[in-house]
């Protein structure tokens, strides 16, 4: 008599097979993203299958505790202390270095160990692992700190916010979860850079983590800036510290760049002094993109991760201001932004999480392809037309648009 395998055994067998495929691809130097996603999904299924429903629900509802623990450990510089020790470190030593009580630190450390953020090599003796070692990078740590600070606080107000809008996101500016959480009237960026500059500095560092990430394709990898005429002007609207323009300017010495932002404070960290030849071609201009675009007739206007932070009505205003400055059938508008592909791939879970984060901080969601097409068609009486588009990275789209008339 053959005994059928239980669902748990079938899943375990599937995980074993997938793990073998993963190992083979890694050894062959091939991309194993598909296998990684499948293994993670199958392990989650197995976890859910063998965990009692009440225990599972408790764990899901209390998932904020790891965010809290990471925030505490970052605030106490625990990861840097462990790195400086260069060996497994006792709770007693860590508590002395942090200046906090052992009982409080123990609580945070246990949570980190339970979620595989730290290793406990012997009772109350801790060490970094590959995951926590990533947080020794200042920019990567800043991103995680942002998520466990502003992200966690604003998320707590999301149910209240959604109730206030009756479950329907307005297309116009309105009071959002971030403003409720911190009791402010300012928008996200105004709050960070004017009301809470310390958090603003941390956020700027966090954004460098994304911009400098090796996995992120650059905009110049899909749009050929070399075809532009000598002396052509590229205007980066909302360009912040100028990460994109400085990078492109180094590759294309025949172009000039204007970086527009609220503060227009100059180069990013690590670029405090631009080489003279580069500095002659790159300048900053104070500009609020909700107002009239001061640079008429530029060859290229760049909007990178700007529209995702704004409601439909605000996006329409931002785009109209640029369209009014464009030369018909000449100027190019490059929109580099997030897109919701509505797929069921491994990216969709992260996209769903970030969608809730966007809703908390900006009162918006990632747009689908249909949403983007609708938005562009409604700008300035239909003056914009898409001439090219590229899907790059997971959940990221670049549109090239021209003014028709």
Curated annotation (Swiss-Prot):
It is an enzyme of class 2 (transferase). Keywords: Methyltransferase, S-adenosyl-L-methionine, Transferase. S-adenosyl-L-methionine binds at residues 238-239, 261, 290-291. InterPro entries: COMT-like, O_MeTrfase_dom, SAM-dependent_MTases_sf, WH-like_DNA-bd_sf, WH_DNA-bd_sf. GO terms for biological process: methylation; secondary metabolite biosynthetic process. Pathway: Secondary metabolite biosynthesis. One of its GO terms (molecular function) is O-methyltransferase activity. PROSITE patterns: SAM_OMT_II. Its EC number is 2.1.1.-. N-methyltransferase; part of the gene cluster that mediates the biosynthesis of the benzazepine alkaloid nanangelenin A which contains an unprecedented 3,4-dihydro-1-benzazepine-2,5-dione-N-prenyl-N-acetoxy-anthranilamide scaffold. The first step of nanangelenin biosynthesis is catalyzed by the indoleamine 2,3-dioxygenase nanC which produces N-formyl-kynurenine through the catabolism of tryptophan. The two-module NRPS nanA then utilizes anthranilate (Ant) and L-kynurenine (L-Kyn) to assemble the dipeptide product nanangelenin B. Belongs to the class I-like SAM-binding methyltransferase superfamily. Cation-independent O-methyltransferase family. This is N-methyltransferase nanE. It comes from Aspergillus nanangensis. The gene is nanE.
